């Protein structure tokens, strides 16, 4: 490709409304342009990267035995009503009516459509197992689209769905997809980590997320220092204390605490050890019989709402109770709540169950109890894992301790079981002629999100540093004063021809531009290898070669450059 015949729309200035580096650089490098909130057009450079990501995803899906199909982005609402998600999904589901007043949605995902397709096309166990995938545009009406392609409303996704009669083949396909996702991210040259995850609104029995590691990642990953164990912070299991509860050494006493509305203020004012305090959080209960539930964690710990959501007593999704309701039921407001004398169900974290001589609110405004001990001062409550893990704690596999990293979720695989097939009556006849509900798996990759995540992991102060496999161009040719020197023109054109014939994506900057502008553009758009051609180089019989990632410059003899570039590009 010649720059003179290409839409290279680079910008010097960082757009004011771009918050994260990938959004900034995708705009500056001329990869995307905003059309409306969360909606973007891909310019040629951006589309080249997107298509390379898409190609790797497609190749690995095909290798894993998945079969490509294509389903409509517009879906009939009737299917969503069947599964109950018409009501459950929320405002992210964009709903509309056609001219005949029929309800439709813009698909954020395709479980309903694929299940409907399979129940019509597959009738016998002989047609199973089956794994179908598509690469299709999705739409989620995010309340606040942000971070460019990291959280846009419209995005490109690969979603696969597998169908089975038995758990064994479902497990085999799940493992194949796990390996395929690992291969995809490895081929793209990205540092990543698969982690155990909560199944969320999609549901199911097993789930893994695939995270590209980056400091800007929205997700916190807890991983073992001694093994491959890793989990999303929402899923990471807190250790159950092995030490017995300490004996009581303090008397229970009621203390005036007028200026201690938070744990931090209580600890500072009374010189307490924060691990000797608890936080009492009141959430909405799951039934009229239990309208409120108290969840108690240690003062230095944070409530894990995903874990709390799984408690039978707690309404789903977890909702903090309004202060007015708390005051009406308990007689005190947040900041003065505790377990003694509570007339609502209590669930305490494992770490709280072994505490002794601890402090908590007295359920009277501006008062706390100090020296609380279980069994002596109040009965032991229901115990559960309801908190986030913290760095340094032992991991559940016993092989190390927790460490933390930030990640950007780019892939998610689920074992759905019969969540959708049962509600939609997707059945087949087994070998005995009996009707069986299909087991399902679901496997998603954010194709457009990978592009942004790759940038978040690969950039410097000059621009993007693309991994080799997904760079828009592998080689950039920079001829100095090309329009004044026939020698430079001839050699640049020959190299351009040779690289094209070798199947290498090359960009020849044939503009009448200052060298500084040409260099800046090549670095901004992240081309891995650049070759500078000038009269001085020609006199010396060498090309000046620069590696974008390392910054290393070398003078390469004419007869060696092509082999060097072939080896560098092909890896």
UniProtKB/Swiss-Prot annotation:
<dbReference type="InterPro" id="IPR023717">
    <property type="entry name" value="Pro-tRNA-Synthase_IIa_type1"/>
</dbReference>
<dbReference type="InterPro" id="IPR006195">
    <property type="entry name" value="aa-tRNA-synth_II"/>
</dbReference>
<dbReference type="Pfam" id="PF00587">
    <property type="entry name" value="tRNA-synt_2b"/>
</dbReference>
<dbReference type="Pfam" id="PF04073">
    <property type="entry name" value="tRNA_edit"/>
</dbReference>
<comment type="function">
    <text>Catalyzes the attachment of proline to tRNA(Pro) in a two-step reaction: proline is first activated by ATP to form Pro-AMP and then transferred to the acceptor end of tRNA(Pro). As ProRS can inadvertently accommodate and process non-cognate amino acids such as alanine and cysteine, to avoid such errors it has two additional distinct editing activities against alanine. One activity is designated as 'pretransfer' editing and involves the tRNA(Pro)-independent hydrolysis of activated Ala-AMP.</text>
</comment>
<dbReference type="InterPro" id="IPR045864">
    <property type="entry name" value="aa-tRNA-synth_II/BPL/LPL"/>
</dbReference>
<keyword id="KW-0648">Protein biosynthesis</keyword>
<dbReference type="InterPro" id="IPR004500">
    <property type="entry name" value="Pro-tRNA-synth_IIa_bac-type"/>
</dbReference>
<keyword id="KW-0067">ATP-binding</keyword>
<dbReference type="InterPro" id="IPR007214">
    <property type="entry name" value="YbaK/aa-tRNA-synth-assoc-dom"/>
</dbReference>
<dbReference type="InterPro" id="IPR033730">
    <property type="entry name" value="ProRS_core_prok"/>
</dbReference>
<dbReference type="InterPro" id="IPR044140">
    <property type="entry name" value="ProRS_anticodon_short"/>
</dbReference>
<comment type="similarity">
    <text>Belongs to the class-II aminoacyl-tRNA synthetase family. ProS type 1 subfamily.</text>
</comment>
<dbReference type="GO" id="GO:0006433">
    <property type="term" value="P:prolyl-tRNA aminoacylation"/>
</dbReference>
<keyword id="KW-0963">Cytoplasm</keyword>
<dbReference type="GO" id="GO:0005829">
    <property type="term" value="C:cytosol"/>
</dbReference>
<comment type="subunit">
    <text>Homodimer.</text>
</comment>
<dbReference type="InterPro" id="IPR002316">
    <property type="entry name" value="Pro-tRNA-ligase_IIa"/>
</dbReference>
<dbReference type="GO" id="GO:0002161">
    <property type="term" value="F:aminoacyl-tRNA deacylase activity"/>
</dbReference>
<protein>
    <recommendedName>
        <fullName>Proline--tRNA ligase</fullName>
        <ecNumber>6.1.1.15</ecNumber>
    </recommendedName>
</protein>
<dbReference type="GO" id="GO:0005524">
    <property type="term" value="F:ATP binding"/>
</dbReference>
<keyword id="KW-0030">Aminoacyl-tRNA synthetase</keyword>
<dbReference type="InterPro" id="IPR002314">
    <property type="entry name" value="aa-tRNA-synt_IIb"/>
</dbReference>
<dbReference type="InterPro" id="IPR050062">
    <property type="entry name" value="Pro-tRNA_synthetase"/>
</dbReference>
<dbReference type="InterPro" id="IPR036754">
    <property type="entry name" value="YbaK/aa-tRNA-synt-asso_dom_sf"/>
</dbReference>
<dbReference type="GO" id="GO:0004827">
    <property type="term" value="F:proline-tRNA ligase activity"/>
</dbReference>
<keyword id="KW-0547">Nucleotide-binding</keyword>
<dbReference type="Pfam" id="PF03129">
    <property type="entry name" value="HGTP_anticodon"/>
</dbReference>
<keyword id="KW-0436">Ligase</keyword>
<dbReference type="InterPro" id="IPR004154">
    <property type="entry name" value="Anticodon-bd"/>
</dbReference>
<dbReference type="InterPro" id="IPR036621">
    <property type="entry name" value="Anticodon-bd_dom_sf"/>
</dbReference>
